[in-house]
Curated annotation (Swiss-Prot):
PANTHER family assigned: PROLYL ENDOPEPTIDASE-LIKE, PROTEASE FAMILY S9A OLIGOPEPTIDASE
Keywords annotated in UniProt: Cytoplasm, Cytoskeleton, Golgi apparatus, Hydrolase, Nucleus, Protease, Serine protease
Record-stated family: Belongs to the peptidase S9A family.
UniProt keyword annotation of Protease present: yes
Organism of this sequence: Macaca fascicularis (Crab-eating macaque)
Gene Ontology annotations for the cellular component aspect, listed alphabetically: cytoskeleton; cytosol; Golgi apparatus; nucleus
Protein name (record): Prolyl endopeptidase-like
Top-level lineage group: Eukaryota
Cited InterPro entries: AB_hydrolase_fold (IPR029058), Pept_S9A_N (IPR023302), Peptidase_S9_cat (IPR001375), Peptidase_S9A (IPR002470), Serine_Peptidase_S9A (IPR051543)
Localisation per UniProt entry: Cytoplasm, Cytosol; Golgi apparatus, trans-Golgi network; Cytoplasm, Cytoskeleton; Golgi apparatus
Length: 727
């Protein structure tokens, strides 16, 4: 469930545009742009309404992964020379896919944006914005506030909801799955709700109330995937809409965040490594904003508020990892910050939640999850180690000062609810049916020694009763960019694979964020090759410890994860049998040299500036997948790209695919008759964008590819898919 209490850290650090949803939905540590950072989400059964027949939006919990961003036109389909023909008869995969696509949509669980405010719950029902009494939120007794079809968009869905403090207005951001463009509608609440106004291309937005009891909406405007302008608007008899702030540095973006107690609205001006925050008084929004601390290169900070004190999560000072500091709200400058709490070394701060008497930190340390509960009255700290099966948090809305609810999940286990009760000082877990996967599978935390001696964590899943793991298929997952954790949310198809005997391995290589800020720093710019060395070490370690073998090893990556995946295919193709890539970033050099692209300047801190720095240019040439394709044997590759993806270089994907096929053809000629060429498939999906949900068609196509390339029997896996995907 969502309301104005938001994911604190994710709303800020992980709203960076490269995540795939700047100022729109999000993916979390770096999550989906479905405002998974910007709003709190709960699983809710979606009820179709009679008023509209458009299918509702299905979204994934942690989809927001950093990404390149582009527009691409005049795309020509790629001739799939090496693609194996499908059998004439419809096989098990096709039957499953067909059944999934024709199944009534309401049979599936939907991630639905909800906001609880006052005595009401606001949410999307079918294609309508509705509200119902809190106690009636799970039945069909609701009031329709706005029909999304009035906007005449194709399959619209609500991305974010904000309710004005006195519930005179509600603002909703509406998008379609084919575009990242959004429309923010303002609905005046009355006996007959009406749309008061609408604004295009809104990213983040928040309500405050001024001294005259008038509702004021602050919002950011997105142009060419960048958010540089902040506006404020009023409605009713005193309508006004004015630009309030413009960020002139193109390498920064702007994001709004309302502190949990609604006392301050923060204007967050950020890039990948540096931030600056201004405070707007929630009681006097027309007063000039107050600067907390002018931007200092390399210093990140995020702000919460409680009882006239600011709590600042920052990397300032040594060590350069996040620490919690505190200062009086009327003396916010950095020289007044006092150290309040420090993290252990190699600890990742996933989120922070502020309560009346407690501050709760959600952490990852040594590849395990923890919750630290800090008593603000006595500075006491209670550290709770969470179950070892858990790999990810899903934050829940919380307006109750006595409880802190959240969910835990893993790639093969559906989310489970937990609640920390402050009065008892204990963590309570949801009771009921125990997931059988806990008894039929194992989760292992392993480490691989990289080329320079650095230990790289891995998370491995396999069936408990599996015998001779060396003969089992292995699916490697990698990302390693932007300081983002490898996505480990629940995926039904991953569970099906484990049930069918697969080994899943998640390699937390440098460049990601699993071990904190330094882990990211050691895998960006002129240290990108560390991530590649880590990935190679992980795969070799798994093989050496008896997990699968190269002929049964596959690799999957999304977006910027395609850099390491593509680089490995160039330098060590013998480690892999098949690779699946989704919206992959494959041409780093040409992309970063094109400063006309909307986000290139914001990406310089991650990849470097090859246009002005010869050192960066030469270094990128060493690992860039496109630049290093050569005539040799490659694993089979399945690439999924999206026709309307604004954030990934689609032309670059096409060029990469053609160049790869040419290299394979040249190698085949040199090798001679009898050479078995790998299967190279480019699947360009119509519509969609970089943050579109996983479709059943895509899932079945990718699994089909893996099974066929490894020569495995797919009969049982599709029966299980039918069960887990609910038809």
């Amino acid at each position: 469930m969502q309301q104005k209490t938001k994911l604190f850290l994710q709303a800020l650090k992980y709203s960076i545009p490269h995540l795939g949803k700047c100022m729109q939905k999000q993916h979390l540590n770096h999550y989906n742009f479905a405002d998974h950072y910007y709003n709190r989400i709960k699983l809710k059964k979606y009820h179709l309404t009679k008023c509209l027949q458009n299918k509702p939006k299905i979204s994934e919990l942690a989809r927001n992964i950093p990404s390149r961003s582009f527009s691409c036109k005049d795309l020509q389909p790629v001739k799939q020379e090496n693609e194996k023909p499908l059998p004439e008869n419809m096989d098990a995969f096709e039957k499953v896919r067909t059944k999934l696509e024709t199944q009534p949509q309401e049979e599936y669980e939907i991630i639905n944006v909800e906001v609880k405010h006052g005595g009401f719950v606001y949410y999307q029902e079918g294609c309508c914005l509705v509200r119902s009494k809190d106690e009636e939120a799970d039945n069909d007794n609701y009031e329709v506030l706005f029909n999304l079809e009035e906007l005449k968009l194709d399959q619209p869905f609500i991305d974010c909801i904000r309710v004005a403090p006195d519930e005179k207005y509600v603002a909703a951001k509406i998008r379609t799955e084919d575009s990242e463009a959004s429309t923010c509608v303002i609905i005046k609440l009355s006996d007959q709700p009406v749309m008061e106004a609408s604004f295009p291309n809104v990213s983040s937005f928040e309500w405050v109330k001024d001294e005259e009891d008038e509702d004021v909406l602050f919002y950011t405007f997105q142009r060419n995937l960048r958010c540089h302008d902040v506006y404020r608007a009023t409605f009713g008899d005193n309508k006004r809409n004015e630009r309030f702030y413009t960020e002139k540095d193109p390498s920064y973006f702007v994001f709004l965040y309302l502190t949990k107690d609604s006392r301050f609205l923060t204007i967050n001006i950020m890039n990948k490594t540096t931030s600056e925050v201004w405070l707007i008084d929630g009681l006097s929004p027309w007063d000039p904003p107050v600067l907390i601390q002018k931007r200092i290169h390399g210093v990140l900070y995020y702000v919460e508020h409680r009882d006239d004190e600011l709590y600042i999560l920052t990397n300032v000072g040594e060590p350069t990892e996040f620490k919690l500091m505190r200062t009086a709200a009327d003396t916010p400058a950095i020289m007044n910050w006092d150290l309040f709490f420090t993290m252990k070394r190699n600890t990742k701060v996933i989120d922070l939640d502020m309560f009346k008497d407690h501050c709760v930190l959600f952490l990852k340390h040594s590849n395990l999850l923890y919750v630290n509960v800090i008593g603000l009255a006595d500075d006491s700290v209670r550290s709770l180690k969470l179950p070892p099966w858990a790999c990810g948090f899903i934050m829940d809305t919380n307006s109750d000062p006595k409880n802190c609810p959240f969910q835990l999940c893993s790639p093969i286990r559906s989310p489970k609810y937990y609640t920390y009760k402050f009065a008892e000082g204990k963590l309570f877990e949801e009771t009921g049916h125990e997931d059988p996967i806990t008894k039929t599978s194992r989760v292992l935390r392993l480490e691989a020694k990289s080329k320079d001696g650095k230990l790289v964590p891995m998370t491995v899943f396999h069936k408990t009763d599996s015998e001779d793991l060396q003969k089992k298929p292995l699916l490697i997952h990698v990302y390693g960019a932007y300081g983002m954790d490898l996505k480990m949310n629940f995926r039904p198809e991953r569970r099906v694979l484990v049930d069918d005997g697969w080994i899943l391995a998640y390699c937390h290589v440098r460049g990601g964020g699993e071990l904190g800020l330094q882990w990211h720093a050691d895998g960006r710019l002129t240290k990108k090759l560390n991530g590649l060395a880590d990935l190679e070490a992980c795969i070799k370690t798994l093989h050496g410890q008896g997990f699968s073998q190269p002929s049964l090893t596959t690799l999957t990556a999304f977006s910027a994860g395609g850099v390491l995946a593509g680089a490995l295919c160039n330098c060590n193709p013998e480690l892999l049998r098949a690779v699946t890539l989704e919206a992959p970033f494959l041409d780093v050099l040409n992309t970063m040299m094109d400063t006309t692209l909307p986000l290139t300047l914001e990406e310089l801190e991650e990849w470097g500036n090859p246009s002005s720095d010869e050192k960066h240019k030469n270094y990128i040439k060493r690992y860039c997948p496109y630049q290093n394709i050569k005539p040799q044997h490659y694993p089979s590759v399945h690439i999924t790209a999206y026709e309307n993806d604004e954030r990934v270089p689609l032309k670059g994907i096409v060029s990469y695919t053609e160049k790869l096929k040419e290299a394979i053809s040249e190698h085949a000629k040199d090798t001679g008759e009898g050479y078995q060429a790998p299967n190279i498939i480019l699947d360009i999906q119509p519509g969609g964008n970089h943050v579109i949900e996983d479709s059943h068609k895509k899932i079945t196509a990718q699994i089909k590819f893996l099974y066929e390339e490894l020569g495995l029997d797919s009969t049982s896996v599709f029966e299980d898919l039918k069960k887990y995907l609910k038809f």
